[in-house]
């Protein structure tokens, strides 16, 4: 069955696109569990408060998420023309990425597998 002209299909697909400003960090060298600790602290907060929380958070993931949040703010300002003072974090989540497998030699000829976990971190902003 014909679904319509190619340009019409494209138009319909673009109409359903999410226009909220966002930023995604792929293959971040931090586990999902550790990233979620930091993301839970800033979810739903306005961006200035979130930047303050991230600046004084001692976890390694907070530095990655702080840079990602600044990128999302810049996207909102430049691409969407939004006011920075009205922005807040609507969604933030971390998903699994491929795991790097490494071998650590142990006693009596054994080899233990070390899993270096990666994650994909996404932040979506919106205006209040």
Swiss-Prot record:
Keywords: Ribonucleoprotein, Ribosomal protein, RNA-binding, rRNA-binding
A Gene Ontology molecular function term of the record: rRNA binding
Composition skew (Basic and acidic residues), residue ranges: 9-21
Region (Disordered): 1-22
CDD domains: Ribosomal_L22
GO BP field: translation
Superkingdom assignment: Bacteria
InterPro entries: Ribosomal_uL22, Ribosomal_uL22_bac/chlpt-type, Ribosomal_uL22_bac/org-type, Ribosomal_uL22_CS, Ribosomal_uL22_sf
One cellular component (GO) term of this entry: cytosolic large ribosomal subunit
Pfam families recorded: Ribosomal_L22
Gene3D superfamilies: Ribosomal protein L22/L17 (3.90.470.10)
Subunit-level organization: Part of the 50S ribosomal subunit.
Family: Belongs to the universal ribosomal protein uL22 family.
Protein task: This protein binds specifically to 23S rRNA; its binding is stimulated by other ribosomal proteins, e.g. L4, L17, and L20. It is important during the early stages of 50S assembly. It makes multiple contacts with different domains of the 23S rRNA in the assembled 50S subunit and ribosome.
Xref: NCBIfam families: rplV_bact
Record-given protein name: Large ribosomal subunit protein uL22
Source organism: Lachnoclostridium phytofermentans (strain ATCC 700394 / DSM 18823 / ISDg)
Lineage: Bacteria, Bacillati, Bacillota, Clostridia, Lachnospirales
């Amino acid at each position: 069955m014909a679904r319509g002209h190619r340009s019409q299909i494209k138009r319909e697909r673009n109409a359903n696109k999410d226009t909220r400003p966002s930023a995604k960090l792929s293959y971040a060298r931090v586990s999902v569990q550790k990233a979620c600790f930091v993301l839970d602290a800033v979810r739903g907060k306005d961006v200035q408060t979130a930047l303050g929380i991230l600046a004084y958070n001692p976890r390694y993931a907070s530095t990655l998420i702080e840079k990602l949040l600044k990128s999302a703010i810049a996207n909102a300002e430049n691409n969407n023309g939004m006011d920075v003072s009205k922005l807040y974090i609507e969604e933030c989540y971390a998903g699994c990425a491929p795991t790097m497998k490494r071998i650590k030699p142990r006693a009596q000829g054994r080899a233990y597998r070390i899993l270096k976990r990666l994650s994909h971190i996404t932040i979506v902003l919106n205006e209040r």
